[in-house]
Amino acid sequence: MQLPPLSAESRFRPAVYGLIHALVDAACVAAVVRASRGSYLGDLSTFWTVAGYDLLAFGLEFPLGLVVDRLHLTRFSMIIGTAMAAVVLAPGPIPALATMIVAGVGNGLFHLGAGGLVLRSAGGRAAPAGVFVAPGALGLGLGMWMGRTGRGATFPIYFALAFAVIALITLDKPALKWEPSKGSHALPRSGSGGQSPPAPTRSLEPPKGSQEKLALLPWLVLLMLLLVSVAVRSFVGFGACFQCPGGLAVAIGLPVAAFLGKLLGGMMADRLGWLRASTGALLLSLPLIAFSGGSLVLALPGVLLFQSTMAVTLVAVYGLMPRWPATAFGLPCLALVAGSFPTFFPAGKQLFGRWTFVLLIAFSAAALALALCRLARHGLARDRRFMGRRTGGARATPG
């Protein structure tokens, strides 16, 4: 079964949100790094300010996502998050702690709102999610450069974000039609729900009622496989960056490689099949990352391949909970910060090593492959999204 074609609006919207995503990330990171370097509150250091920002921006996305979905606030969350990103760049002194909190919460709210709307409008495809998340890597790189060097004017980003807030309020009202209808927030029900565009043919959301409790176990197992795969990739990704030497080439090369990987990964997965493209990319990245030895010639292609699986993972998690798009976007973000947390400390960095990376990448690929195969067996592979062109829908779905 072929997926229906996306409307022009559904193709255009992820790109617009992706551009705002880059601006939001650049603003938040630049403001946090600059504030931490130039203003201290007690023993608040640059390290803890940036770490606190990461924990707020990514760690809170799961609980905030539950609230956003429950109250149907995806569009509101996106607008408020964009406005908060503009606030941290507003003229005038802002304490480092306040900057960290406003930037972290604002960044998370934008991710949940815009990411949830993109997932809901993607029609079961991975490419729109990749188009949305990819520019964030460029924004992160730009924000780190601006924050560390103190160079680059923040006024253009501030005014661009202010304009984006006005545009989202006045011009983006069609996004309201993607909000779930009343009563569709009940997580233990199946189906695509609400007024969302075409979604996976079946949902693996945990069932409702004591007589169906056994079905909760495979749902949780699939979800944990996807999230553990993300957490492991987060740890290895930080390790790959840690091994690279400093300098302008790394500051530019790593964000560009991550951008291209996320952008092209979703497109290639939709074309070649999610399982084939995602696990293949991870396995191809294994020798490049594990044995790069800090060489950018090997590390950058490895990072590109490594990052190409994020879009598939996001849409696969959404396939498990299609009535909860913001939560589905927030859970992988929580896994990202969980995987990166050990790298905040010297003891965690001691785990970096080529054979550790070999084992972890292989484990991540196996977890992702197992999850995608099980999703296919449960009716989410009646087209070419999961297994590719050779294993089309009817054979991939049990009769």
Which residues does each PLM region occupy?
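Conserved MFS/SLC helix-loop-helix module at the cytosolic interface between two early adjacent transmembrane helices
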Residues: G59-P91
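Cytoplasmic membrane-interface "Motif A"-like loop-to-helix N-cap segments
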Residues: D69-G81, D270-L283
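Symmetry-related core transmembrane helices of the 12-TM Major Facilitator Superfamily/SLC fold
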Residues: T154-K173, W355-R374
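C-terminal transmembrane helical hairpin of 12-TM major facilitator-type secondary transporters
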Residues: R276-T313
